[in-house]
């Protein structure tokens, strides 16, 4: 297994791309990762504005207060995701990492990697496994790019795809398969956002996962 720099990914906060004013609060929270959101929670009519506001944050030296900074783009299989990638390629100050949602094949990751390499962007990748096709191909996806730092398990969308309840037992196989693929590729693995804030002890009960993700800041 190759030696890697150890990066703490114990806690994770989403910050909406339309609200750059919330970014200082997020980075000052002490979290390990701040993810600026362009996908879920951003209405189609607001996608362009959210993209513009988010990428403008990286036009100057951005102080993340020690937090890892990630931008979750839209799926590269739709027009919004393609526009996100195009904007990242066009800027001379790309985000340090992007999160790829709803990945179905390793070719999607390879394509993004190749485009970033052509522009000599050093942007890292985080990949969400939340589709049945992605689950089937997860072992190949995990090894599709040296830019990948972590796999995320998207349990809510996965439950919808598998037509099962979003609960521990029905998703145990899917969650375990993602964990195994990540371990085999020497990647971190991060669980579905934890939503039951009244049961914090439940957040500890995670199977082979580096960390669960909390909700928005």
Where does each model-flagged region fall?
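N- or domain-start disorder-to-order transition segments that initiate the globular core
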Residues: 2-25
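Hydrophobic faces of well-ordered beta-strands that scaffold small-molecule active sites
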Residues: 11-14, 34-36, 69-71, 98-100, ...
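Active-site beta->alpha loop and helix N-cap motifs at the rims of alpha/beta catalytic domains
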Residues: 51-111, 134
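Conserved small/polar residues in nucleotide/adenosyl-binding loops
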Residues: 209-216
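Glycine-enriched alpha-helix->loop->beta-strand junction motifs that scaffold or abut catalytic
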Residues: 30-32, 90-96, 145-150
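Conserved, mostly hydrophobic/aromatic
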Residues: 26, 37, 98, 141, ...
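Glycine-rich, proline-tolerant flexible connector loops at the mouths of alpha/beta enzymes
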Residues: 35-50
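Active-site glycine- and acidic-residue-rich loops that bind
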Residues: 126-140, 162-169, 197-202
């Amino acid at each position: 297994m190759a030696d890697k720099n150890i990066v703490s990914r114990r806690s994770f906060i989403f910050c909406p791309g339309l609200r750059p004013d919330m970014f200082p609060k997020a980075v000052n929270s002490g979290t390990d990762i701040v993810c600026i959101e362009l996908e879920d929670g951003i209405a189609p009519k607001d996608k362009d504005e959210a993209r513009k506001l988010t990428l403008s944050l990286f036009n100057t030296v951005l102080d993340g207060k020690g937090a890892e900074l990630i931008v979750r783009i839209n799926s590269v299989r739709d027009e919004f995701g393609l526009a996100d990638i195009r904007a990242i390629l066009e800027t001379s100050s790309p985000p340090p990492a992007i999160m790829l949602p709803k990945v179905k094949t390793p070719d999607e990751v390879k394509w993004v990697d190749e485009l970033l390499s052509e522009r000599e962007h050093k942007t890292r990748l985080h990949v969400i496994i939340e589709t049945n096709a992605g689950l089937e191909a997860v072992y190949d996806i995990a090894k599709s790019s040296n830019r990948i730092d972590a796999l995320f398990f998207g349990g809510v969308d996965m439950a919808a795809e598998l037509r099962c309840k979003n609960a521990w037992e029905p998703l145990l196989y899917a969650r375990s398969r993602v964990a195994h693929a990540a371990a085999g590729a020497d990647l971190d693995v991060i669980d579905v956002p934890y939503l039951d804030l009244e049961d914090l002890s439940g957040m500890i009960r995670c199977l082979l996962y580096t960390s669960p993700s909390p909700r928005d800041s």
